Each structure stands twice: as C-alpha cells, then as structure tokens.
Amino acid sequence: MATGKIVQIIGAVVDVEFPQSNVPSVYDALNVTDSKERLVLEVQQQLGGGVVRCIVMGSSDGLRRGVEVVNTGAPISVPVGTKTLGRIMNVLGDAIDERGEVGAEEVYSIHRSAPSYEEQSNEIALLETGVKVIDLICPFAKGGKIGLFGGAGVGKTVNMMELINNIALQHSGLSVFAGVGERTREGNDFYYEMQEAGVVNVEKPEESKVAMVYGQMNEPPGNRLRVALTGLTMAERFRDEGRDVLLFIDNIYRYTLAGTEVSALLGRMPSAVGYQPTLAEEMGVLQERITSTKSGSITSVQAVYVPADDLTDPSPATTFAHLDATVVLNRNIAAMGLYPAIDPLDSTSRMLDPLVVGQDHYEVARGVQQTLQRYKELKDIIAILGMDELSEEDKQVVSRARKIERFLTQPYHVAEVFTGDPGIYVPLKETLRGFKGLLAGEYDDIPEQAFMYCGSIDDAIENAKKL
C-alpha cells in the first residue's frame, strides 16, 4: 500500500503528497496513521505532482504537516446486512452507541452506480400513511420518493417521526434512518422513542427493524456530505435481498449545505446564491440510487429545509425534480394552530390520478382543493366587506372550507407527550367517507370546532354532541 505525507491543512480539506507512481484515485479512502481515533480522508481532486486534495471524515484537530497517510486503494466501505439493525453508526459505519462493534459479515462501498433501466421496477402501488391530508391530497407511492418541504419550526421532523411510526410499524418492514446535519438531541430522542415503540430491541438486536446512521450538525462537512450515502448503501443491501425498505433522510438540505462548504474549501467557483456548481449532479447521484428494482423496493421520505420559506431557492428547487410526491408545510397554517401544517393547495403527488387512486378518490381530493381555493379567493372580500356581503352560495363554500381545514387536522402518536391527546391512525376509506360527506353538505349542521383534531367523521359527530 502506498504511503504519503500531509503537506497542507485547511480546516476540513487536507493535501497529501504521494510518490508520482502511486497516486490514489478519486474517492479512494486514506487512513491517517498516528491518529488516536480512526481518521479517514477521501480523495476529491488530483492536483498534479503526486499531490491529492482530500476531505476529512472527522475532525482535523491535532493534524500536522508531515504526518504519514496510507492509501487503502478502495473507497470508504461500510457494514451492511441484518447486523446493522438496532445500531447507531457514523459515516464510516463504526458503531457510536457504545454497544461494541457492528460485526457485519459484509461491507459495501458507499460509492455505487444506480440500477440500470432493465433492473428498475415500474409497478404502481399506494402506501397508506394514516394521515388524512397526505392520503387524500398527496398519496404516497410504494417505492417512490417523497419530500417534506418546510421552513424552520413548522413540523418537518414531527411529520417524519409520525410517518416512521405509522408506516414502519404498520408496514413491519425494515427501515434505515439517515440523520444528516440535524440536532443531536433529535437523534437521541428518536433512538429512545424507537426503543419504546419496540422498533429497536437492545437485548435482542436481531429483532430490531431500523438501522440508524448519524452525522449531526456539529460534525465536519465531510461527514455530513457522505452520511446520506452510507445510509443509502445499507438500504440498497436490504433491497437487493428482496425486501421492501423505508429510507428516511432528515435533512436533505444539510447534505446540499455540506456540499457547499466542501466545494468552497476545494476552491470551486460558487454558482447561484453561493451553492456549489455541481449542485444538480450531487443531488442526482444520491437520488438516482434511491429506486426500486425487480427484486425489492426503497421508499424514501426526505425532509427538505426551505431557507427563508422560499421554495424557489436552488436547493429545494433541485430536489423537487426528483420526487414523486411533495408535502409542503405552510407557516400560515401552523400560525392558525392547525397541525399537521400541510398545505393542501401546494402539496402534489403523481399518484393523484384517476387511473391509480380511482375516480372517486380523485374527485373528492379535487373537490376539497376547489373549495379551499375558492375560500382563499374570498378571504380578501371578507376582510374588507365582511361575511354579510357574500352570496348564499359563497357563504356555504366558506362554511364548508373552514370545516375542511379543521377536519384536515389530526392528533399524532409522536406528539402525544406534548398535547396529551392520543394519536389516531385514520384508514383511507374513512378519510374519503368523511370528506365526501363534507362536500355533499351532509354535515353542514355540525359546528366547525367539532372537526378540530378528530380522527374519522364519527369522532366529529361525537364531539358535536358534547358542545
């Protein structure tokens, strides 16, 4: 194995000089020899003269020029298979849960090519989530890519936790959770919540259903840039075994941000809004690998932070292109105290097609959107002239729209500790029955507050009796 010496250190970027005859390839992993903990460098550029520029997969504190570095001759490889279940790992696949080595029989390189056209599956099946607004307006595809878009503090992580709770527990398949540049506290909470739910079994790890890979906010940009690929590699292995896997990534924006930091350190010219010039390519490399094959499926749910609530920002805009369903969280809905704060007029899904969901579902969903859109248009008139100036027909639209807005709320299992209300899983059949009745005027006599935070329409009728 070729050895080289560190010649320059600029934060998370390190230059290493090798003999001209033994220069490492791009993406090769290099091991730093005299580091107390395992420290890996990943080659990003060949500068000529035997010098390669690398990003550090860890802290560069204490590194100095002249330190010896060994080329492994292969990209970073991480453990895969059932031994990863119930464990928390870092970007290199090393266990960070203080429960010993992962001890997997097999390792995969984190840099792999996407499945070919022949291998990809084109089956269409719906994935029920138990969340009314999602199942009605933006239904998820099994094996599809779903994005949760929202600014700071509107509920991306809570919605993702609820989806993990509803889908992973109901679906009883395997899941991989990649925490990319998020808060350590959230990762810690998630781990203990999964233990309480029985998804992680510490005594019998083989009975666990989820593998966790974390690269938190305090980690260097190299870790945050590669941790999504580590999680995806583990999910790909389960898929190739013929399983249906759920891949949760929180947050895809931090992946882009880490790429921006690394790009600047590597000396690349920034593009729009300071993002890296390779933004679309980096996003494509990750997203194209998240796909279903004829052997198994990967259904991915990705939280996407929207900077300053601007959906036209290059990072969320680049992510949009790859998704099958987009769930947009709206700050104005959250400000009204209506949770989940999902915007039914902005959220979309390619599955909302009469040929996929059926004519009945399609008409109910479009009817709900039309009613809410009309109410939105009438809000200005109401603000200036008041309700009395509206026609009888418009008054009815407003009344129904306000009931629909409230009926789209529901208590979450994961929020029970904050709200005190037990969570409710609402089957799609019940969701459609409730909204169909609302549009037809069957519940015009029920006061709107009865619809707040209820499950099925029967709960709303019960609430009305108590008012």
Curated annotation (Swiss-Prot):
TM stretches of this protein: none
Entries under Gene3D superfamilies matching the protein: 2.40.10.170, Bovine Mitochondrial F1-atpase, Atp Synthase Beta Chain, Chain D, domain 3, P-loop containing nucleotide triphosphate hydrolases
Name of the protein this chain belongs to: ATP synthase subunit beta
UniProt binding sites for ATP: 150-157
PANTHER family: ATP SYNTHASE, ATP SYNTHASE SUBUNIT BETA, MITOCHONDRIAL
One Gene Ontology molecular-function label: ATP binding
Primary location: membrane
Catalytic activity from the UniProt record: ATP + H2O + 4 H(+)(in) = ADP + phosphate + 5 H(+)(out)
Membrane topology field: Peripheral membrane protein
EC primary class: translocase
PROSITE patterns: ATPASE_ALPHA_BETA
InterPro entries assigned to the protein according to its UniProt record, in alphabetical order: AAA+_ATPase, ATP-synt_VA_C, ATP_synth_F1_bsu, ATPase_a/bsu_AS, ATPase_alpha/beta_chains, ATPase_F1/V1/A1_a/bsu_N, ATPase_F1/V1/A1_a/bsu_N_sf, ATPase_F1/V1/A1_a/bsu_nucl-bd
Function description: Produces ATP from ADP in the presence of a proton gradient across the membrane. The catalytic sites are hosted primarily by the beta subunits.
Phylogenetic placement of the source organism: Bacteria, Pseudomonadati, Pseudomonadota, Gammaproteobacteria, Vibrionales
HAMAP family the UniProt entry points to: ATP_synth_beta_bact
Record family assignment: Belongs to the ATPase alpha/beta chains family.
CDD domains tied to this protein: ATP-synt_F1_beta_C, ATP-synt_F1_beta_N, F1-ATPase_beta_CD
EC number: 7.1.2.2
GO cellular component: plasma membrane; proton-transporting ATP synthase complex
Keywords for the protein's UniProt record, in alphabetical order: ATP synthesis, ATP-binding, Cell inner membrane, Cell membrane, CF(1), Hydrogen ion transport, Ion transport, Membrane, Nucleotide-binding, Translocase, Transport
Location in the cell: Cell inner membrane
Subunit and interaction comment: F-type ATPases have 2 components, CF(1) - the catalytic core - and CF(0) - the membrane proton channel. CF(1) has five subunits: alpha(3), beta(3), gamma(1), delta(1), epsilon(1). CF(0) has three main subunits: a(1), b(2) and c(9-12). The alpha and beta chains form an alternating ring which encloses part of the gamma chain. CF(1) is attached to CF(0) by a central stalk formed by the gamma and epsilon chains, while a peripheral stalk is formed by the delta and b chains.
